[in-house]
Amino acid sequence: METIAITGGRGLQGCIRPAAAKNSVLPLLAAALLCGEPCAVSGVPPLADVATSLALLRAVGAAPELQGDTIRLAPRPLCGDIPPAVAGAMRASVFYLAPLLIRAGAVTMPLPGGCRLGPRPIDIHLDGLAAMGASVQAGAQAVTLRRRGALHAVDYTLRLPSVGATLTLLMAAACAEGYTTLRGVAREPEIQDVAAFLNAAGAEIAGAGTPVLTTRGAGGLLPGGARHTPLP
């Protein structure tokens, strides 16, 4: 095991510019697909998962533009097939379930990888999306979701406060028809960050940072876009 030795006794001074938090950046790039107008996410760190996210976006038909530390996305027709090589490299590929289901009408995703924290199943994601009207076919290697018409509002309680499932269902609720209540949700800062981004694009989300999220859905894509700098 590597060791880092720090010798103190010296004063520190100066300033640093913290990069945006990966836990916010990755779901924000997926959430940008829900916007009907161009979006920009700034302060993006040069991480492997960010590069994988850009590859995923290009694979489904998006055209992300990376300029310095800013990623820009404009609405384009999308397909719902996530390549196995991309999904297997990054746990955050699960964030694209709801956006691609909404944009393409169907999404097929090989089971995601990239996680060193042990198995983290996606059953809450799938159960919540099924409650909103999606049909779910889950196999040993991949999962396929389809919808007929817009997703519908629900009053849904998460089995446990999963951050990923909270983000997935929040994105779905923002574009569903009607007024959705999500109970027992995660309260991490990235939930608040993604909610702020979606609200800037025209969503109506309240309660981020509390155990209950309420959302008045747009019944389709959000009407606007947003420029957003994620939390550090």
Predicted segments, located by residue:
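Structural preference for solvent-exposed beta-strand-turn elements
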Residues: 1-232
